[in-house]
Amino acid sequence: MCIRDSKRGVPSVITRPPYAQTGDPGPSILPLVRTSDEIASMRKAGAIAAEVLLHVGENVTPGITTDKLDQIAHDEIVRLGAYPSPLNYRGFPKSVCTSVNEVVCHGIPDSRQLQDGDIINIDVTVYFEGVHGDTSVTFYVGEVDEHSKHLVQITREALYKGMDTVKNGSRVCDIGKAIEKHAHSNQLSVVREFIGHGVGPEFHSALAIPHYFDRRATTELTTGMSFTIEPMLNLGGNTLHMWDDTWTVVTTDGRRSAQFEHTLVVTEDGFEIMTKTSSGTIPSEYFAN
């Protein structure tokens, strides 16, 4: 049986998102296009999220618990003056999500020890200067099998295939089309129930980014829009099951799942990655192997 510790504290001097006390983010009501000041703050929030993900990733080793990884992330987030966005978002009890092997997303850190050969996605989001920065990487734990390496590598590539379609005037459906094509050509399935989303002053804003081709997703991307792309690909089928904790989502067939994520802002001729460190290091590339 895995044990979950209680929520971690955040110093009172750190600015909290509106939902921090109640857990209720309310409806998404803000514009999809960011101001120049908001984009400047998103660079800072994204840089913190990337720094934290790099720091946590260096601690992914056999024997460590996912709760310890959560503690490492939490301590680094607050040290850098930010708030861990998942904490109490709709009641989520931890500061990051840790999704191991067949867990697709929203795994809750607990006393589970990582084993040699596991894979783990760590999803870090921070709130800083009134905006969120959201990013994730799937890590190898020790030596993993070739099927898992294939899954992780193709999922990383699929993220970048989707990103490469982003520019002013392109359509949301172009992102999913590119991701789905790359996944299927490499014999992987695409999760449909969980998608990318608008992000900025709100953790999840109204813009929806499917990771599969959806001809209804005709929204035209406009300079200044900010959102995540975060494909989840599976070795087996794409049917899912949610645990009784109402957060943890797993593959129905028990096969492994991987995910990578960046926060982007649309530019006139492409995009800018928000979730890179102040020195330009991008976690999804730093840990590529």
Sequence positions of predicted segments:
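Active-site neighborhoods and metal-handling regions in enzymes and metal-associated proteins
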Residues: R4-N289
